[in-house]
């Protein structure tokens, strides 16, 4: 006769649950408890129990947890947790520095081109053409001209085509120089200020001399006119 797997199940008949009036005595698991005295005397079962741990009933289930295994996994878990925290902190630190640099870079690039009237793509193409022109013009010259002429023409075109962006770029380069080479930048600033002062003074001297010369020429012309009646102006 085949077994009917779909029969009506009686838990008591199948001994799944005890009868209603039955008395169930829970085992204290004394037979699985380590006896230190017998373990020291070399009783095999007690030595085995010492390694597999004492038996404990947890919700009616026999559980063994040796102390050395608990210590082992506790130490390994702590080591893994410490290493994991160290790795995650390192990753967070690297990611934070990367995002900070990315934000600094994007904000710096955005701060360079601030004038909407300056068309970026045509300006960059003009700078490229000017640099290539300088390279072509200095192709058969000395190495110094070949190295500097593209930079000079490109910079001049940059300052002419996009003056606001050029000033912002020069300010950025100056800040980078100040952070990297502060002493050199200070000397460079002093030289630049002195050069500007001399240039301004030279222009002023030129206009003063021109004004003085025009005044003297005018006086001389008036004197000749008064003496001879000839207009020499």
Curated annotation (Swiss-Prot):
Ranges in the topological domain labelled Mitochondrial intermembrane: 1-119, 165-233
Keywords from the named record: Membrane, Mitochondrion, Mitochondrion inner membrane, Transmembrane, Transmembrane helix
Record's function text: Component of the MICOS complex, a large protein complex of the mitochondrial inner membrane that plays crucial roles in the maintenance of crista junctions, inner membrane architecture, and formation of contact sites to the outer membrane.
One GO CC term on file: mitochondrial inner membrane
Subunit structure comment from the entry: Component of the mitochondrial contact site and cristae organizing system (MICOS) complex, composed of at least MIC10, MIC12, MIC19, MIC26, MIC27 and MIC60. This complex was also known under the names MINOS or MitOS complex.
Mitochondrial matrix topological segments: 138-141
Source species: Saccharomyces cerevisiae (strain ATCC 204508 / S288c)
Listed name of the protein: MICOS subunit MIC26
Chain ranges passing through the membrane: 120-137, 142-164
Phenotype seen when the gene is deleted: Moderate changes in the mitochondrial morphology.
Domain of life from the UniProt record: Eukaryota
UniProt cross-references to InterPro entries, sorted A to Z: MIC26/MIC27, Mic26_fungi
Family to which the UniProt record says this protein belongs: Belongs to the apolipoprotein O/MICOS complex subunit Mic27 family. Yeast Mic26 subfamily.
Pfam families documented for this protein: ApoO (PF09769)
Topological category with respect to the lipid bilayer: Multi-pass membrane protein
Subcellular location: Mitochondrion inner membrane
GO biological process: cristae formation; negative regulation of protein oligomerization
Other known facts: Present with 5220 molecules/cell in log phase SD medium.
Residues of the signal peptide: none
């Amino acid at each position: 006769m085949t077994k009917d797997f779909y029969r009506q199940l009686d838990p008591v008949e199948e001994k799944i649950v005890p009868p209603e009036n039955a008395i169930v005595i829970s085992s204290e698991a004394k037979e699985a408890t380590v006896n230190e005295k017998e373990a020291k005397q070399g009783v095999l079962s007690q030595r085995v129990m010492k390694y597999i741990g004492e038996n404990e009933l947890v919700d009616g289930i026999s559980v063994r947890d040796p102390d050395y295994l608990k210590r082992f996994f506790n130490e390994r878990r702590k080591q893994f947790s410490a290493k994991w925290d160290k790795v995650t902190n390192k990753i967070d630190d690297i990611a934070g520095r990367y995002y900070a640099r990315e934000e600094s870079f994007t904000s710096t690039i955005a701060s360079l081109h601030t004038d909407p009237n300056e068309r970026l793509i045509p300006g960059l193409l003009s700078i490229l053409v000017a640099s290539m022109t300088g390279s072509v013009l200095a192709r058969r010259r000395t190495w110094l001209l070949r190295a500097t002429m593209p930079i000079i023409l490109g910079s001049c075109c940059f300052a002419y085509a996009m003056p606001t962006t050029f000033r912002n770029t020069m300010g950025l380069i100056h800040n980078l120089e100040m952070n990297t080479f502060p002493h050199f930048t200070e000397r460079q600033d002093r030289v630049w200020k002195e050069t500007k002062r001399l240039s301004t003074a030279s222009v002023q001297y030129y206009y003063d001399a021109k004004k003085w010369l025009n005044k003297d020429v005018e006086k001389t012309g008036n004197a000749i006119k008064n003496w001879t009646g000839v207009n020499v102006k």
